[in-house]
Curated annotation (Swiss-Prot):
Residues anchoring lipid (N-palmitoyl cysteine): C35
Keyword 4Fe-4S on entry: no
Entries under Pfam families matching the protein: DUF732
Record carries keyword Lipoprotein: yes
Function comment: Overexpression induces expression of sensor protein kdpD gene at low K(+) concentrations (0 and 250 uM, tested in M.smegatis).
Compartment annotation: Cell membrane
Record lipid sites (S-diacylglycerol cysteine): C35
Main location: membrane
GO cellular component: plasma membrane
Segments crossing the lipid bilayer: 100-120
Cytoplasmic-side positions: 121-127
Quaternary structure annotation from Swiss-Prot or TrEMBL: May interact with sensor protein KdpD.
Stated name of the protein: Putative lipoprotein LprJ
């Protein structure tokens, strides 16, 4: 059963199909937009975990390790945030050696906030 508009060219069925199509497209694009951030976050987390593995740092809980790695950048920009203070904090939190904590901190900074490496460690990067 179709109902025609005044000019007889458009039916109620066509209107409903157009509305359904628009709703479907809105859902697809909305879903894609909401997935973009988690996918990006997963890519960075995976890159971080891979870099830790390559550096010889073992971890048991990937999600906790990624969260700890992400916590480094706010420490860098906090007042008094020095490489030594951050490394000490990482060693304290994880119970890892100072050298291991230093490597963890460098990998975290290199992954999540690479722009602060040179200002944070000016004397360590000289050839």
């Amino acid at each position: 059963m179709t109902a025609h508009t005044h000019d007889g060219t458009r039916t109620w069925r066509t209107g409903r199909q157009a509305t359904t199509l628009l709703a479907l497209l809105a859902g697809v694009f909305g879903g894609a937009a909401s997935c973009a951030a988690p996918i990006q976050a997963d890519m960075m987390g995976n890159a971080f975990l891979t870099a830790l593995t390559n550096a010889g740092i073992a971890y048991d809980q990937p999600a906790t390790t990624v969260a700890l790695g992400r916590s480094v950048c706010p420490m860098v920009v906090a007042p008094g945030g020095t490489f030594e203070s951050i490394t000490s904090r990482m060693a304290e939190i994880n119970g890892m050696s100072r050298d291991m904590a230093s490597t963890f901190t460098i990998v975290a900074i290199g992954t999540y906030c690479p722009a602060v490496i040179a200002p944070l460690m000016p004397n360590r990067l000289q050839a």
